[in-house]
Every structure is written in structure tokens, then in C-alpha cells.
């Protein structure tokens, strides 16, 4: 039996069951580059019974994800599980859920889209056309974003 030996965190967030190779994208999404001063643990390509193969894990001490960050995480890692840790114990465990409509998280790739106009106070709005594979359609101009490119358009302010 394989055993994972990664340090525990006392307080913070564990993002588990990430598809292999996504841990670094998750850190980029969260704006974490290592200079913040809090502990970040990354395990990549470790064995997972749940996923039937490999997975990545990210542990972030003393950091908790906002609702917006959780929604963005669902766009790049729909199989992720978020564990909230307090005093060394898991106090909450939840999967991420991709909503049917994604608002204000993505930038439309179409430079002419009204949602990109600085003069219009309009949040971007994408309809989820397909969850697997992920395919999103801009509500305003109809531009399509495919799964492989979605992380390029995530814009958390």
C-alpha cells in the first residue's frame, strides 16, 4: 500500500483531487507565487484511488478561498475537493460545483465584446454549453472558450 507523506497544516485550505499537472495553475489562479510568507505545500502526480490514477494536492496555510476563487477553481479543476482545516482537523469538506452561468470571472477573448468596454459597467457572463469537455459561450457576443484555454481568460480582481 502506498502512503502519502506530506506535512499537515494546522489552519487553512487543502485543495485535493486536482487533475494531474494542475497544481501550478491553481496557484496562479489564486495569485500565489511564494512571496506571501505563508506555507504552501504542493504534491504533484501522487496516486489517487478516487481518480483512478494520479492527482495533485495543494495545501495553503492560513488562507481560505473566497466564493469567487472557488467558482474559478471549478473551471480548471472540476474534480477538486476543498478541505477547510482548523486546529489540525478537517472541519468542512466540499466539492467544487460548476455553475450554469459564470459571471465576472472570465474575460471574453473577443476584444470587441461589450463586456470588455471600459465605458460600459457590464460584468462578463458566460453560459456553460458543456461541462465535459468544458465549453463556455459569451452571453453578449457568442464567443466560445474551450476547456484547454479557459485558464488564459480567468480574471480575479
Curated annotation (Swiss-Prot):
Keywords: Metal-binding, Pyrimidine biosynthesis, Zinc
Name of protein: Aspartate carbamoyltransferase regulatory chain
NCBIfam families: ATCase_reg (TIGR00240)
A cellular component annotation (GO) from this entry: aspartate carbamoyltransferase complex
Known cofactor(s): Zn(2+)
Residues that, per the record, bind Zn(2+): 108, 113, 138, 141
Annotated GO biological process: 'de novo' pyrimidine nucleobase biosynthetic process; pyrimidine nucleotide biosynthetic process
Matches recorded under InterPro entries: Asp_carbamoyltransf_reg_N, Asp_carbamoylTrfase_reg, Asp_carbamoyltrfase_reg_C, Asp_carbatrfase_reg_C_sf, Asp_carbatrfase_reg_N_sf
Complex and partners: Contains catalytic and regulatory chains.
Similarity-based family: Belongs to the PyrI family.
Co-factor binding details: Binds 1 zinc ion per subunit.
The keyword ATP-binding belongs to this UniProt entry's keyword annotation: no
UniProt keyword Zinc, yes or no: yes
General function of this protein: Involved in allosteric regulation of aspartate carbamoyltransferase.
Pfam families, sorted: PyrI (PF01948), PyrI_C (PF02748)
Coiled-coil annotated residue ranges, if any: none
Gene Ontology MF annotations: metal ion binding
